[in-house]
Each structure stands twice: as structure tokens, then as C-alpha cells.
Amino acid sequence: MQSTTGNANIVRRVAEGTPVQALDLLGPTVEFVTEPDARGSFCVLRGVLPPGMTVPMHSHDDAEDFLVLTGTHQVLLQGPDGLEWAHAHAGDYVHIPAGTPHAHRNTSPDPAVDLVITSARLGQFFTEAGRPVTGPPQPPSPADVARFTALADRYGHTLGTPDENAAVGIEMPKFAGGQ
């Protein structure tokens, strides 16, 4: 692997199994393709949405762009008649403007893998909110959820309420000892 920092060129051979720390974001995982440096202007990640996993409705001041590399998932987007689910398949590109409510869910039997391009600020949020992946996936504890929610609030993210999520077909998970 060749890698430099600053304004120099970077080559990171993620596809060849170069060790990159994966972070668990309460189910989905991300791996940084670019350095997770808040001083940069953008961030590139490899995101994995496991089968059966849903990222509930949320919004933030950072645009996100997704190129679906493998698999398929549904993305909740603002359409002409309100929020609607769109299927995103391998090769599809999805743009989510800043401040737009959105969600993701994988109803397929296979993981959905995306190349995600967003702001360095959102990358910094992922760095702070994520738990290092060290083994098989573990369900989040109530403390993990509370920590994630507090960080989202600190970063100015808006998390959909259970009623807002239910209105678009998302059932919010119940965690032992809390909501």
C-alpha cells in the first residue's frame, strides 16, 4: 500500500485486503478509504449494510453520495410527492442533499456495499460514533445507543422519531433496558 498525507497523491488498495479499521455504526460498518482527517474537505468510505439491517430516518448538514458496489438496498429519499423508497442496485448512484431526511434498509439476503463520499465533518462523526470491529457483530447496548444519540445531537443531526419512522415503514429496534 502506498499512502501519503497532505496534498500528495494517495493510493490505497482497499480491494486487495489492505488492513483498514472497520467501524460499527450500530449495525452498518464503514471503512475509511481516505484518511479520517477532519481537516480535509471530503471523506470517502466503504460502507456495508448487512442483510436485514435498517438505518432509521435521519438528516444532517452534510451531503452524501453513494455508488452501490455490490448488492441492493432501499433508500428513503425526498420525491415529488414526499418521502419514498427507491431501490438502489450495484452500479446505481444516489445523491442525498444536505439537510434531507433519508434512511436505508437492506431487505435482500446479501450485504449491500457502497462507496460513500461525504464531508470530512461527517467522517469525523463516524470516527467518534463508531465502535471498532474486533469480531462477530454484537448488538448495541443501551449505552451504545445513548452515546450515538448524544454525538448525533452534538453534531446537529436530526434523528427521526419512532412515529416518523413508522410512517415510512421502519420499525425502531427495542434495546434491552431502553428504547
Model features per residue range: what roles?
Residues M1-F42, G135-P139, V145-Q179:
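A short, N-terminal "cap"/entry segment at the start of jelly-roll beta-barrel domains
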Residues R13-E16, P28-V30, L45-H60:
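Conserved short histidine dyad/triad with adjacent acidic residue
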Residues R13-V14, A38-R39, D65-L67, G79-A98:
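Short acidic-glycine-tyrosine-enriched beta hairpin
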Residues V33-P36, T54-H60, L77, W85-A86, ...:
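Short histidine-centered beta-strand/loop micro-motifs
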Residues A90, A98-Q124:
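Ligand-binding loop in jelly-roll beta-barrel domains
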